[in-house]
Design a protein with these regions (language model features):
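Short, polar/acidic, helix-capping and beta-turn segments at strand->helix junctions
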Residues: 1-127
Length: 127
């Protein structure tokens, strides 16, 4: 089985020892992705944070040879239940009719108190 590491730009990757994504056979597993911009601070609102998370995930998918159309599952973690409409709207704008299996849960906190959203994704590479 092929196992390929896809790095990202998160400072946590080297410290914790993880990859943004791992390709294992025909599967792409994208790690929990927080709204960490290349430069500057994360956006404030749940909608903008979700869009940034998905943009980062999209880049990892591309480097793995996949697209959003290959995504079969997402998991969204929110720190505030009232953020689900905005996070859901951003998710829906990106995935549209792709409609991956999706779970959204509310957690007590994320690693950085500025983070309101974190998203994981799984994709299957096309033959």
């Amino acid at each position: 089985m092929e196992r390929r590491l896809i790095p990202g730009h998160s400072p946590y990757e080297a410290v914790v020892g993880f990859s943004r994504a791992v390709v294992a056979g025909d599967r792409v597993h994208v790690a929990g992705t927080a709204p960490i911009p290349v430069e500057g601070d994360p956006p404030e609102g749940a909608y903008d944070q979700t869009r940034l998370c998905l943009e980062i995930i999209g880049g990892a998918l591309e480097r793995a040879g996949a697209t959003f159309a290959d995504v079969v599952r997402t998991r969204t973690y929110l720190t505030e239940a009232e953020d689900w409409p905005e996070a859901g709207r951003a998710h829906g704008e990106v995935f549209g009719e792709i409609r991956p299996a999706s779970t959204c849960v509310v957690v007590k906190a994320l690693v950085d108190p500025r983070f309101r959203v974190e998203i994981e994704a799984e994709a299957v590479l096309s033959p």
